[in-house]
Amino acid sequence: MELEKVKINSLHCNDAVLSSHQPSPSATHPQSVPSKANAVTEASIIEKTNLQHNVQEDNSYNRDCDSPVSSSSEPEKELDDLRYLHSSSLTNSVVVGKSTGSLNGAYSITSVTSKTKTLEPNSASGSACLTIAPTADHIKKRIPSSRTPTRKALRIKFYRNGDRFYPGITIPVSNERYRSFERLFEDLTRLLEENVKIPGAVRTIYNMCGKKITSLDELEDGQSYVCSCNNENFKKVEYNTGSQPLSNLTLTNSRSNSHRLAKCRPSSPLKNGLLAGSNPLPTCGGGTGNGSPHIASRSSDRVTVVHPRIVTLIRSGTKPRRIMRLLLNKRNSPSFDHVLTAITQVVRLDTGYVRKVFTLSGVSVVRLSDFFGSDDVFFAYGTERINTAEDFKLEAEEHRAINVIRKTMRTTGTTCKGPKPKMPIKSKKVYPPVVDSEAFKAATTPEDDRHAALLTSTGMEINELPSNIRNTYTLGRIIGDGNFAIVFKIKHRQTGHSYALKIIDKNKCKGKEHYIDAEVRVMKKLNHPHIISLILSVDQNTNMYLVLEYVSGGDLFDAITQVTRFSESQSRIMIRHLGAAMTYLHSMGIVHRDIKPENLLVKLDEHGHVLELKLADFGLACEVNDLLYAVCGTPTYVAPEILLEVGYGLKIDVWAAGIILYILLCGFPPFVAPDNQQEPLFDAIISGIYEFPDPYWSDIGDGVRDLIANMLQADPDVRFTSEDILDHPWTIGNQGNECTTYKR
């Protein structure tokens, strides 16, 4: 007698059918019934056989279907039902020769077809027979064969370069999600900005050994990589590889995840601290009231004390000891531990990490605020033993080195010897106002004749002007002239809005055409309230025409000539706007290379006060992908590293801005030479030594002097960044908050 294991099929099975109430063939032909013990033994053997058969079919199904079916698909539901019944068969299966007690009468098993098994009652009073679940072979035939497996996305963890406290982010990476390497850079930039403060866009990816990754194919599943911004070199530190990832972000719900996880996000060495008056960081308790007082005090301490400053470090070791400097700001000093990490990277102790820091008087530094107090010289120690009697004494050579450093940071006034220094000669001329005279305006000549007269005065013909510019704008007076270009004031015929038309003569730029292309390319990328906007560009064989935003007040050089010097409040407005423009440029990896008063346009009110400042003239601007070596710029504003030809980057703009801020407050530059001779001027710039002479600086506070001293550091590594300018207390303050004490 053929015996089969009984499995009750789920009611969800679409192939379930009800068998007719007919006598079972096994019931009409009497057969010998085995003993109860034999029946149980035989049923157990058959049950094991069917169990192995079902496991083989399940494995075959898994091999055929590499990509799992959606949980809502009908075949998977059937297969789940089959597996569920199979898993429960050891306890709920009907065994031949035994009554289950759940149906009326005993049951016998009959094989109806190869695909369907039915259960029928022996007695006429039994209920309808139930159909057994279809086999796995039948389910496999119903699964669409056109389904192809998709490539699994790689799970990659990314760290911030040099940030050993940041736990990293884990995101899926695949060729389907990222069609190009640049697209991955964009998403990493966005995701990192939600967690840490980064100095710019992600431009390079390294593996944990420092090897540069150049394509998506080089990324490996489950591995970690380091993101670098603004072409920073790889920093080999102990990244936080042992911690849990900050968030397993997906690109579809990154904003919601970021908002959810922000409540308990730890501090990062590159997270920009909050400005005074900003809301404090949320705590893990969900609010300031429920948070830990210790955490709240640390956050408040960071907000109030951290500001950009340069400190001097004395490395422990054999005397005379090495002396170096470090720029502390809100990006590398959000906590005490982060400052120790920054010091470790600079001093490079033989014993490893810096564990202990002392002031020059031997007082242990234990709080973040101690780095931003009156002391600016610190001893850095690792695990070595400290000899308090000898280690805190400076030798004569060490004293001299510290005094040289302090000389570059000196903000005290000195008596001016000789006549007052003068401003340098303006680097570009402005045409006399005869072109804009009332007689010329009242002339009855046709408009084209007026345009022709204006252009003829510059050696150009009216027919050379592009038709779309000639038909859209009316030509006004000449407002400026450079080495290669002429600037007209123009007015839109329909709206009446004023614009500036810059005409670049290509014949005067032979061999320098790349500067023109770079200017247009850079300006098309820019959109900032303190940067002149490019409205239209027309390229012709002989000239390049640029329609630009017009600023009514003229350039800053003329404003300085008229008023000689500005107040601190007026200077603060202008340096804020210039700092914001530079920060925007530098975040995009763009350096201006020619920041000077002639290229800064100002908007004035009726009393002559500056309301707004805008950065213009991007003829020398370029993207910074590596150190630059081209010697360019204006002598008075050129940085030392340009003159030394050792390579320069974004911080040359900060140097030029420091020169301008100095000029705004006293009316002359910090570095001057008799008769404007270049060689003595360049020697003075390279030395980096200047003064704040009285009486011109006697009424100017220490706050702005400190800012200038940090912007005019000859060493670009410790020179302020454009963001540090905006974070400085003097820049943040106002007229009623200029009493901050600055000690050196």
Swiss-Prot record:
InterPro entries in alphabetical order: Doublecortin_dom, Doublecortin_dom_sf, Kinase-like_dom_sf, Prot_kinase_dom, Protein_kinase_ATP_BS, Ser/Thr_kinase_AS
Full protein name: Serine/threonine-protein kinase GM11705
EC number assigned by the record: 2.7.11.1
Family statement drawn from the similarity comment of this UniProt entry: Belongs to the protein kinase superfamily. CAMK Ser/Thr protein kinase family. CaMK subfamily.
Keywords for this protein: ATP-binding, Kinase, Nucleotide-binding, Phosphoprotein, Repeat, Serine/threonine-protein kinase, Transferase
Domain Doublecortin: 154-240, 309-392
Superkingdom to which the source organism belongs: Eukaryota
Region (Disordered): 17-38, 54-78
Pfam families registered for this protein in UniProt: DCX, Pkinase
CDD domains xref list: DCX1
Catalytic reaction(s) noted: L-seryl-[protein] + ATP = O-phospho-L-seryl-[protein] + ADP + H(+); L-threonyl-[protein] + ATP = O-phospho-L-threonyl-[protein] + ADP + H(+)
PANTHER family according to UniProt: SERINE/THREONINE-PROTEIN KINASE (PTHR24347)
Sequence ranges of Polar residues compositional bias: 17-35
SMART domains reported for this sequence: DCX (SM00537), S_TKc (SM00220)
Positions of ATP binding: I479, G480, D481, G482, N483, F484, A485, I486, V487, K502
Keyword Coiled coil part of the UniProt annotation: no
GO molecular function: ATP binding; protein serine kinase activity; protein serine/threonine kinase activity
Protein kinase domain ranges (all copies): 473-731
SUPFAM superfamilies in the cross-refs: Doublecortin (DC), Protein kinase-like (PK-like)
Taxon lineage: Eukaryota, Metazoa, Ecdysozoa, Arthropoda, Hexapoda
Residues at the catalytic site: D594
Any GO BP: intracellular signal transduction
Signal peptide region: none
